């Protein structure tokens, strides 16, 4: 498919909520897949999820700035019109100074359009500071993978009134701090709708039901390449791992049986 999309901006993303147009967001970690996704994704997230689904670690927290910068550059090389969102890895925004320093690296060393930061009230001041410096920020609340060790696993949010109030307060505070959008993960559907209705910026869900302003999935979950773990919310549109496995097996068999390369794939003198 030829790409005739114009480069999407922060205003384009925000206007989609105003127009009632669902936002399509997905992850990518390399140029090859980013180039394919570019034709369909409004936002491509270079997520620290790559630590699990690309580097096969057990969690996201050991992802480094060097790793995220490398993969963000790769994605930017492949996707020329999608809005590129880079994840700030665990430990890279523990205070305003380090957050500003590391966010600047994404803007100076890659072509990222914005950064994403996990955390509620404790990171509102950091989000505000980055926005004041001209760095576009997407907040991330609800289930936060970077807190998985602290919380003893991946916990669904919005199960009681106290938690619902906290999430609502966090969303409003993040909006007021200047964030252009909010990622809401692993949150009860009805609560996600309340949050989306309570703020003017887009709320993009993952595992948070349909009543938000857009959806994001990890590409290797969506296309069936990551077989170690399948989240309940991740619909598989393809059994990619099995298709690749069959193709590689066929190639290996053809080499072993001297079927490949045939004359069709050989140079003649």
Curated annotation (Swiss-Prot):
The keyword Magnesium applies. One of its GO terms (molecular function) is 3-methyl-2-oxobutanoate hydroxymethyltransferase activity. HAMAP family: PanB (MF_00156). Catalyzes the reversible reaction in which hydroxymethyl group from 5,10-methylenetetrahydrofolate is transferred onto alpha-ketoisovalerate to form ketopantoate. This is 3-methyl-2-oxobutanoate hydroxymethyltransferase. Mg(2+) binds at residues 48, 87, 118. One of its GO terms (cellular component) is cytoplasm. The keyword Oxidoreductase does not apply. Disulfide bonds: none annotated. It catalyses: 3-methyl-2-oxobutanoate + (6R)-5,10-methylene-5,6,7,8-tetrahydrofolate + H2O = 2-dehydropantoate + (6S)-5,6,7,8-tetrahydrofolate. Pfam families: Pantoate_transf. Belongs to the PanB family. Its cofactor is Mg(2+). 3-methyl-2-oxobutanoate binds at residues 48-49, 87, 116. GO terms for biological process: pantothenate biosynthetic process. InterPro entries: Pantoate_hydroxy_MeTrfase, Pyrv/PenolPyrv_kinase-like_dom, Pyrv_kinase-like_dom_sf. NCBIfam families: panB (TIGR00222), PRK00311.1 (NF001452). Binds 1 Mg(2+) ion per subunit. The gene is panB. It comes from Campylobacter curvus (strain 525.92).
């Amino acid at each position: 498919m030829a790409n005739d999309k114009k480069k999407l901006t922060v205003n384009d993303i925000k206007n989609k909520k105003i127009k009632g147009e669902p936002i399509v967001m997905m992850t990518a970690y390399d140029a090859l897949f980013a180039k394919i996704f570019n034709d369909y994704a409004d936002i491509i997230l270079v997520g620290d999820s790559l630590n699990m689904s690309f580097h096969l670690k057990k969690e996201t927290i050991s992802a480094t700035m060097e790793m995220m910068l490398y993969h963000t550059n790769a994605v930017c090389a492949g996707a020329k019109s999608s809005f590129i969102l880079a994840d700030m890895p665990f430990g890279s925004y523990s205070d305003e100074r380090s957050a500003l320093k590391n966010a600047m690296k994404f803007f100076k060393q890659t072509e990222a359009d914005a950064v994403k930061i996990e955390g509620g009230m404790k990171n509102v001041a950091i989000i505000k500071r980055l926005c004041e410096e001209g760095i576009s920020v997407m907040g991330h609340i609800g289930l936060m993978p970077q807190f998985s060790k602290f919380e003893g696993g991946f916990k669904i949010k919005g199960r009681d009134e106290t938690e619902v109030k906290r999430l609502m307060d966090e969303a409003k505070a993040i909006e007021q701090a200047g964030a252009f959008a909010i990622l809401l993960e692993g949150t009860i559907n009805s609560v996600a709708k309340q949050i989306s209705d309570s703020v003017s910026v887009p709320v993009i869900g993952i595992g948070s039901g349909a009543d938000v302003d857009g959806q994001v999935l990890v590409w290797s979950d969506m296309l069936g390449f990551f077989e170690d773990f399948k989240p309940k919310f991740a619909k598989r549109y393809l059994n990619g791992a099995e298709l690749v496995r069959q193709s590689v097996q066929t190639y290996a068999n053809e080499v072993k049986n001297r079927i490949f390369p045939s004359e069709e794939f050989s140079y003649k003198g």
